[in-house]
From Swiss-Prot:
InterPro entries: MOB_kinase_act_fam (IPR005301), MOB_kinase_act_sf (IPR036703). SUPFAM superfamilies: Mob1/phocein (SSF101152). Functions as an activator subunit for the CBK1 protein kinase. Part of the regulation of ACE2 activity and cellular morphogenesis (RAM) signaling network. The RAM network is critically required for hyphal growth as well as normal vegetative growth, and for polarization of lipid rafts and the actin cytoskeleton. It play an essential role in biofilm formation. The RAM network also plays a role in serum- and antifungal azoles-induced activation of ergosterol biosynthesis genes, especially those involved in the late steps of ergosterol biosynthesis. Residues 1-109 are annotated as: Disordered. It is found in: Nucleus; Cytoplasm. It comes from Candida albicans (strain SC5314 / ATCC MYA-2876). The lineage of its organism: Eukaryota, Fungi, Dikarya, Ascomycota, Saccharomycotina. This is CBK1 kinase activator protein MOB2. One of its GO terms (molecular function) is protein kinase activator activity. The modification Phosphoserine is found at S44, S51, S67, S97. The keyword Cell division applies.
Length: 313
């Protein structure tokens, strides 16, 4: 793993610069089917500007009343407040920022004896690029600053996720995926600048997330890279929000595009990457287990295989 073979620049020395944070082309999840160009801290990975995305998302938003961090399912509903902040698209300034509130609405599905999703079927569920647990490579190394380690890993993981999404992006059309769903029973909604929850096409939701995360990573006041820069008091909160939105992209791809991943012979890379991501967010408590529900059967399967360390009881 390129970013784990060296922790160059983590000491916040005078030689540290943005080039140290750029991903290597020899990263473990690199593949001939993936783009060779990694995300740079000064580049936006989106094809559309935030202002264009905003104008697209504004149409018809008045018809929706749900929260962007809600997970809706058919059947009986249950609602509770979540302390994590949801994302809010700022149409006035053309940028994305988190809102101060979010809620989760869950309902239990009455569907029984349904066929398991493809990613839970043999042999795909056991396919992996790396064997063994990822715990040892996500743990905080000795003499490394806690926030530096979080920042470096989030940057690397987001870069890899963005590249994987680029592989299946052409299939994620608004017509094919009119909602940001993670299976038939889970749907993610987006809170706009007016506080309204809108049901966006998956591609637009993901573009909003990518734009927001990219802006965070490029913001020196949030993810400082210059010598002497201090991490802000809400840095951990930003890490949690970024990790939560990254998980939703994982969930959408697993439930809707895993067949394309298989067709491109990337299932081993994808499974190992997801196991790595979950190991990292579990190690630093960045995502609540309730938020992982759309992929919880897969996570528990990986735990049984030893790819992810099970939580101590």
């Amino acid at each position: 793993m390129s970013f784990l073979n060296t922790i160059r620049g983590l000491g916040r020395g005078s030689k540290k610069n943005k080039k140290d944070l750029e991903p290597s082309n020899n990263a473990i999840y690199s593949h001939s089917n993936l783009s060779g160009n990694g995300l740079r801290r000064t580049q936006s990975p989106t094809k559309f500007s935030p202002s264009k995305l905003s104008s697209k998302g504004a149409q018809g938003s008045a018809a929706y009343t749900s929260s962007p961090t809600k997970r809706s399912r058919t059947g009986q509903s249950l609602q509770h407040q979540d302390s994590q902040s949801s994302l809010q698209y700022q149409q006035q300034s053309g940028s994305v920022s988190p809102s101060k509130r979010s809620s989760i609405q869950t309902t239990k599905s009455t569907t029984v004896n349904a066929d398991p999703p493809l990613f839970l079927c043999e042999p795909y569920v056991k396919t992996a690029l790396v064997k063994g647990s990822f715990k040892t490579i996500v743990q905080l190394p000795k003499y490394v600053d806690y926030c530096e380690w979080l920042a470096l890993n989030i940057f690397e993981l987001f870069n890899h996720l963005n590249r994987f999404y680029g592989v299946i992006q052409e299939y994620a059309t608004p017509e094919a995926y009119p909602t940001m769903n993670a299976g038939p029973n889970t749907n993610y909604l987006w809170v706009n600048s007016s506080g309204q929850a809108v049901n966006l096409p998956a591609c637009q939701y993901i573009e909003y997330v990518i734009t927001w995360v990219t802006n965070k990573l490029n913001d020196q006041s949030v993810f400082p890279t210059k010598n002497g820069g201090a991490f802000p008091p809400n840095f951990i909160k930003d890490c949690k929000n970024i990790s939560r939105q990254m998980f939703r992209i994982f969930a959408h791809i697993y439930h809707n595009h895993f067949d394309k991943i298989i067709h491109l012979s990337l299932e081993a890379h994808w499974n190992s990457f997801f196991a790595h991501f979950i190991s990292f967010v579990k190690e630093f408590n960045l995502i609540d287990r309730t938020e992982m529900e759309p992929l919880l059967p897969l996570i528990e399967n990986f735990e049984q295989q030893g790819k992810i360390t099970q939580a101590s009881k």
